[in-house]
């Protein structure tokens, strides 16, 4: 019969031929036959003697061996199928055939992934996409908190509800972590493995899932450092979960989950990109469907997985509020309030960043609608060439004088007619932004409008309504508040005019408020910077901002009143060895001037500076001191140089007529005491003073005026040569010692003979009596003023 002839010998006829045509003969091929073929690109050759049987196997009714023989093994692929064609038409390298071949190869790859699992990524991709391989064993929990808490049956209802709320926080954290792993271990890993063999290379895995690994790492650290320890404590002790243990972890919520800022900024673009790829890319749509049907996906769609991070980060305050509602203890309430505030503060930060990003995108879209900047008509090509670098308007620049996070916004736009001077009306299109008004003219052949007038800054703009209900006047001022330009704006209706005036006035008010807030914020930051520098500075000068003239005057008056009265003191020392020496802040060594009006226990830095300064200068030992010679606030050029301090304040007991406290014995030996009987007491006293306090040879320190406080001025000592100054100092000290000794009333000492200016020599007994406490005698106070 002709029907049993070779398949390639003319058209087939008869019943068998019709069956062959129906089930896929040489003239028609079904997609299922090619899809089920193990050798679509040409496999092992088939014995020519068996080629005639390959089309008749499905209808054979012979033995069981023949019935069980697979037609895929006996059938030889058609020549067209060796090129990957489903339909056997067209050249093998046409775009349609390539697409069909890629779809078939994608199905084979996905089937291989289902059978043998997802291949591991290459080493260059593992570092970013693989998170904690083998570390998921710690991400396990019991089915209920009652398995951990031993005495859960004896707990009251409110405490049980608290444990349920805490358990919900822990369980939802693990569930969310597993959903994040679906995106990296299934979707991202599958896409990257397909791209390694040349499939879906046009899809960006970084755009879809680039920030997800950072989210997983953040949540794993949060689980290991915050949530898992409280779970382990309950497992060990059997006590209920303590919400206070979560406080330290949630107080650092913002630092832990910084990757959410970037993710939330890009989530809308990511979801739009995923929808676009599914709608326009059949291969990607096939891949996504395979992933959604995978057993690991849990019937989660790609859109559901991409929106999960945004939903999770906003759910933390609700979970903590549920725990707080069921925690009556004040300690737990306080801790939970702090945790909720930390989380909500971070969410406000994210919302601000998202809002700023949306405003930036909106401004960019508006900026693309505004074309060239042609506010001048150049007179020549040379002029035009020089104007070209300055003929670009960039609306993306920040607004001047406001916080950097504030973005310029488009408030109003619309067509109007303007008139400038005596010229006729012109149709323009106005753009009202947060800080500027643009006058543009639409272009017929383009969608962009060109700027025809210089930008009108709102802070220099004045709007005045005119008698015409549809018109108002725009006046632009200079820095000198003079008119720069004026435009008469004619709106289509009175409603439009009212709308333009209202929006412009509101924008000006808002801009002024924002600039005021920014000025206050900058002033606070500057004051804080000054305070920080003052704290770190080693100088004794208090580091404060520059005071106003009124403050400086009041402070100077206060210091003048404090040191206005400086008494003359005649000081004697007690050298009793049995009396312990008093501390410097409660006694006077006789080297300084005590102030009667000072409080008893004054420990001001100025007094300590003066005390040290007086001890270092021997010329102040037996002389009356005037504070004008000692700067109140010295500024040594070397921070390591010794600082001058003030003299200690006069104790209250001294002010009431008491004696000075006793000091340590003077620096001389008993042998020197024996020599005093035959020596001159004035000379010996001067000798001891020079030995005890030699003139310092340290580098001279200068005060704020650039003068040395230890150098005698010309007004006090006159213009003396260096050779005469020591002698003058010696004579002054001798004269002052004579006056001090003359004012002392020593028991048992006879008055000196009249006419004899030299003091009489004292015996050892008289000298010992001089060492006992004596009453301080004050001379007439001297009024001094600070220079």
Curated annotation (Swiss-Prot):
Residues 724-742 have a biased composition (Basic and acidic residues). Its main location: other. InterPro entries: DBL_dom_sf, DH_dom, PH-like_dom_sf, PH_domain, PLEKHG6, SOS1_NGEF_PH. Residues 409-509 form the PH domain. GO terms for cellular component: cell junction; centrosome; cleavage furrow; cytoplasm; microvillus; spindle. Keywords: Cell projection, Cytoplasm, Cytoskeleton, GTPase activation. It is found in: Cell projection, Microvillus; Cytoplasm, Cytoskeleton, Spindle; Cleavage furrow. PROSITE patterns: DH_2, PH_DOMAIN. Residues 533-762 are annotated as: Disordered. The keyword Cytoplasm applies. GO terms for molecular function: GTPase activator activity; guanyl-nucleotide exchange factor activity. It holds the Pfam family SOS1_NGEF_PH. Residues 161-353 form the DH domain. Residues 535-557 have a biased composition (Low complexity). Interacts with MYH10. Interacts with ELMO1 and EZR (in an open conformation). Interacts with CSPP1. Guanine nucleotide exchange factor activating the small GTPase RHOA, which, in turn, induces myosin filament formation. Also activates RHOG. Does not activate RAC1, or to a much lower extent than RHOA and RHOG. Part of a functional unit, involving PLEKHG6, MYH10 and RHOA, at the cleavage furrow to advance furrow ingression during cytokinesis. In epithelial cells, required for the formation of microvilli and membrane ruffles on the apical pole. Along with EZR, required for normal macropinocytosis. This is Pleckstrin homology domain-containing family G member 6.
């Amino acid at each position: 019969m002709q029907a049993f002839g070779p398949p390639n010998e003319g058209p087939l006829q008869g019943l068998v031929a019709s069956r062959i045509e129906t089930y896929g003969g040489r003239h028609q091929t079904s997609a299922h036959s090619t899809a089920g073929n193990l050798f679509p690109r040409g496999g092992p050759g088939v014995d020519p003697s068996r080629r005639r049987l390959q089309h008749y196997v499905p209808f054979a009714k012979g033995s069981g061996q023949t019935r069980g023989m697979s037609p895929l093994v006996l059938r030889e692929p058609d020549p067209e199928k060796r090129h990957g064609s489903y339909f056997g038409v067209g050249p093998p390298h046409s775009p349609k055939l390539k697409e069909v071949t890629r779809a078939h190869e994608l199905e084979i790859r996905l089937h291989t992934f289902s059978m043998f699992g997802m291949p591991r990524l290459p080493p260059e991709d593992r570092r970013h996409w693989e998170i904690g391989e083998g570390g998921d064993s710690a991400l396990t929990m019991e089915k209920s908190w009652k398995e951990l808490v031993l005495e859960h049956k004896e707990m009251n209802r409110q405490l049980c509800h608290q444990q349920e709320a805490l358990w919900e926080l822990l369980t939802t954290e693990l569930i969310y972590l597993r959903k994040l792993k679906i995106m990296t271990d299934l979707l991202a890993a599958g896409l990257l493995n397909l791209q390694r063999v040349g499939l879906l290379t046009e899809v960006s895995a970084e755009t879809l899932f680039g920030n997800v690994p950072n989210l997983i790492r953040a949540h794993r650290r949060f689980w290991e450092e915050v949530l898992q320890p409280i779970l382990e404590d309950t497992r060990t002790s059997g006590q209920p979960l303590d919400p206070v243990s979560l406080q330290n972890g949630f107080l650092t919520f913002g630092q832990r989950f910084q990757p959410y800022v970037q993710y939330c900024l890009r989530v809308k673009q990511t979801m739009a990109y995923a929808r676009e790829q599914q709608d326009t890319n059949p291969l990607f749509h096939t891949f996504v469907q395979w992933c959604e049907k995978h057993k690991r996906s849990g019937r989660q769609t790609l859109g559901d997985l991409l929106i999960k991070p945004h939903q999770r980060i906003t759910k933390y305050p609700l979970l903590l509020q549920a725990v707080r509602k069921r925690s009556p203890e004040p300690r737990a309430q306080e801790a939970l309030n702090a945790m909720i505030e930390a989380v909500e503060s971070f969410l406000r930060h994210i919302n601000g960043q998202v809002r700023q990003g949306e405003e930036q995108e909106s401004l960019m879209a508006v900026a693309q609608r505004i074309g060239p900047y042609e506010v001048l008509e150049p007179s020549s090509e040379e002029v035009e060439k020089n104007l070209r670098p300055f003929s670009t308007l960039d609306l993306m620049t920040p607004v001047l004088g406001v916080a950097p996070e504030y973005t310029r916004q488009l408030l109003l736009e619309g067509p109007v007619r303007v008139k400038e001077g005596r010229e006729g009306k012109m149709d323009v299109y106005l753009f009202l932004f947060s800080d500027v008004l643009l006058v543009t003219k639409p272009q017929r052949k383009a969608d962009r409008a060109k700027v025809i007038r210089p930008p009108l800054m709102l802070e220099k703009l004045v709007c005045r309504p005119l008698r015409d209900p549809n018109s108002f006047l725009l006046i632009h001022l200079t820095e000198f508040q003079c008119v720069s330009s004026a435009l008469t704006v004619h709106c289509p209706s009175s409603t439009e005019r009212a709308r333009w005036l209202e929006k412009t006035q509101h924008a000006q008010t808002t801009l002024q408020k924002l600039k005021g807030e920014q000025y206050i914020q900058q002033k606070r930051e500057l004051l804080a910077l000054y305070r920080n520098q003052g704290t770190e500075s080693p100088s004794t000068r208090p580091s404060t901002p520059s005071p106003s003239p009124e403050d400086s005057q009041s402070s100077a008056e206060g210091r003048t009143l404090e040191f206005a009265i400086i008494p003359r003191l005649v000081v004697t020392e007690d050298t009793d060895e049995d009396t312990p020496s008093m501390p410097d802040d409660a006694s006077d060594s006789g080297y300084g001037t005590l102030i009667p009006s000072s409080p008893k226990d004054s420990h001001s830095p100025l007094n300590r500076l003066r005390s040290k300064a007086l001890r270092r200068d021997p010329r102040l030992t037996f002389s009356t001191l005037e504070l004008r010679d000692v700067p109140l606030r010295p500024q040594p050029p070397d921070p390591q140089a010794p600082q001058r301090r003030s003299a200690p304040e006069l104790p209250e007991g001294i002010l009431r007529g008491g004696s000075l406290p006793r000091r340590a014995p003077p620096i001389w030996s008993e042998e020197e005491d024996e020599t005093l009987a035959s020596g001159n007491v004035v000379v010996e006293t001067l000798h001891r003073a020079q030995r005890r306090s030699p003139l310092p040879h340290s580098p001279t320190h200068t005060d704020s005026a650039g003068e040395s406080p230890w150098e005698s001025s010309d007004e006090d000592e006159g213009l003396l040569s260096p050779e005469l100054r020591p002698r003058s100092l010696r004579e002054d000290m001798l004269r002052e010692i004579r006056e001090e000794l003359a004012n002392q009333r020593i028991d048992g000492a006879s008055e000196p003979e009249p006419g004899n200016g030299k003091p009489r020599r004292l015996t050892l007994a008289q000298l010992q009596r001089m060492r006992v406490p004596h009453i301080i005698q004050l001379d007439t106070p001297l009024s001094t003023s600070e220079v």
